[in-house]
Amino acid sequence: MCGIAGLIHRGKSSNVGNELQAMLQALKHRGPDSTGYALYADNDGENFIMRFKVGENVGEGSSSVNEDESVYDKRKELVDDMLKNLGAKVLKEEKLTPYSYRYEMKYDDDLMDFSKKIESIESVEILSIGKSLELIKDLGDAQAVLDRYDLGKVTGTHAIGHARMATESGVDIKSAHPFWGYPFSDVSVVHNGQLTNYWNNRRAVSYTHLTLPTICSV
């Protein structure tokens, strides 16, 4: 089933976090497993915002394997080392949950190579990179995710979101929507329904430079 919501404010900014929450909460009956927000926020536009995770939420309903939080800390250290090697300068970092982070950083090189190297670290996934886009997704309904990540304060111009009922893959953050439009900054994609020719398309895409991290990727 699942549910998709979106909004846009032309020529002005608004509290897109709360507005999208209200829309997605109304769709909870269509997707109770996980919720995702792709918010185009009022950032300064000078630096990249990278949201990434170093593990999964293993709470109630999760299909992920439980891990000790010390593993998350070690993966985060590996990410920091890789960022230094890539020449990225982290200006600000926030630990949002035991398994997810938000970094503000300067980076002037190729995002494809950057992303491949960051995600070569075990269980590390970049959720989004952009100067406006901030992609947040986790288990639970829209209110739970909004509260967990303090999204009620986020202002911006537009947003899309997704309430998911898992049918083709596990209940985890990795399979939740929306997806970052790798390797392009500030691009997010969400889809609904089942593609009947999915595996044919996946095979075709596998011959290109694009990566397909989940069986929900298109």
Regions inferred by a protein language model and the residue ranges of each:
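Conserved short alpha-helical segments that host acidic/polar catalytic motifs at enzyme active sites
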Residues: 1-210
